[in-house]
Swiss-Prot record:
Belongs to the BUB2 family. It is found in: Cytoplasm, Cytoskeleton, Spindle pole. This is Mitotic check point protein BUB2. Interacts with BFA1. It comes from Saccharomyces cerevisiae (strain ATCC 204508 / S288c).
Length: 306
């Protein structure tokens, strides 16, 4: 049994000290990438503990939503258009996760969001029933969890509580994320930032897929999963600094490229440990007020970044 498995098997899971210890173990030891069902269950359980997601009655709630059938034709067609393209070229994902599973989860989310909207109190962030990219956000959860209801429960926690501003109709949180990516790159690598700016390449042009999907649009998926291990532990705001790390890793190719925009459309395969090391190292260079914006822009719809 690993240190992580030993820790999560003990009773006081949600005590502050236990969470701190679990976060440290994620940083120092990490979770292995494995096809083994027990390892898959461990990762899902760790994500559940770190995000403080209750799985109580999750299967019953999921089945109740499934009984409602497909959502409206408009939403259902949007879902179908995207799920058919989800990680099409990744055989490991396709072998483990069916398109039907993606459709079921996203359809349930559309229904649950409509139900929440009917009960909405004034001031709650209006998460959309479906926005493009939700399929790619859901994919790592279905890939990593041993059951659909568990993946769905984590997905709702992620969407409603952890990154709600990214999933509004106008994607205002993701747009703020793009502005923060520009600002962070300017601080960390002024030369690369100026080069991209001179070529009229703002983060809103090249960075939105990685921002909106929390880097799950990048390859390979097993390395994305390791990034998510870290972000469940330390916060999904770290994704912005991870995207900066992707750019810094590519900088020499970007400078030499005749078409940097094409190069930036798909980041190359990466090693998660290296991206995490770089991203964590950048924190010391980021002014406190900018770091606070990185943290808050995921959940605060009123943040304005010029």
């Amino acid at each position: 049994m690993t240190s992580i498995e030993d820790l999560i098997s003990n009773p006081p899971l949600l005590l502050h000290s236990s969470l701190s210890q679990l976060r440290y173990l994620i940083l120092s030891e990490g979770l292995p990438i494995s096809e083994d069902k027990q390892q898959q269950r461990t990762r899902c359980y760790v994500w559940t503990v770190l995000s403080q997601t209750s799985m109580e009655a999750s299967t019953q709630r999921y089945l109740a939503l499934l009984k409602l059938g497909p959502p409206s034709t408009t939403i259902y067609q949007k879902i179908k258009n995207d799920t058919s393209r989800t990680f099409q070229t990744d055989p490991n994902f396709r072998n483990r996760v069916s398109e039907d599973a993606l459709i079921r989860c996203l359809s349930c989310f559309a229904w649950q969001t409509q139900q929440r909207r009917q009960k909405t109190r004034f001031g709650r962030i209006p998460v959309s029933t479906y926005v493009q990219g939700m399929n790619v956000l859901l994919a790592p959860l279905l890939y990593s969890c041993p059951s659909e209801p568990m993946a769905y429960q984590l997905f709702t926690k992620l969407c409603y509580e952890m990154i709600p501003t990214y999933l509004t109709k106008n994607l205002n949180g993701a747009q703020n994320g793009a502005k923060l990516l520009d600002i962070s790159l300017r601080i960390i690598d002024p030369k690369l930032s100026k080069f991209l700016s001179d070529n009229l390449l703002t983060a809103e042009i090249y960075g939105m897929p990685s921002i909106l999907t929390l880097s799950s649009c990048n390859k390979p998926l097993d390395q994305v999963i390791k990034l998510w291990d870290f972000m469940f532990a330390y916060g999904f705001h770290m994704n912005i600094l991870f995207v900066v790390a992707f750019l810094v890793k590519m900088r020499s190719k970007v400078f030499k490229s005749d078409s940097p925009v094409n190069l930036l459309r798909q980041f190359p395969d990466f090693d998660a440990d290296e991206i995490i090391r770089l991203g964590v190292g950048f924190i010391a260079k980021i002014p406190a007020q900018i770091y606070d914006l990185l943290v808050d822009h995921l959940t605060d719809p009123d943040i304005y970044i010029p």
